[in-house]
């Protein structure tokens, strides 16, 4: 796994463990992290799937500002891979 994906997974795991983030956002972050770690699928497929999932949750009105900023950071890193 590349360093960028490791960095992204680390941020997603932080969101997953953050209690101030709503459960649906934490679950989506956890699923995204697991998808990125799944070596059986092609990297471009994994990244595009995660981009779609995270883009959807970044528009959730209940997401705290700090978590939204982290998700935007993840999206930016994934788009640059």
Feature map (PLM): residue ranges:
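Peripheral, non-catalytic segments of secretory and membrane proteins
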Residues: 1-81
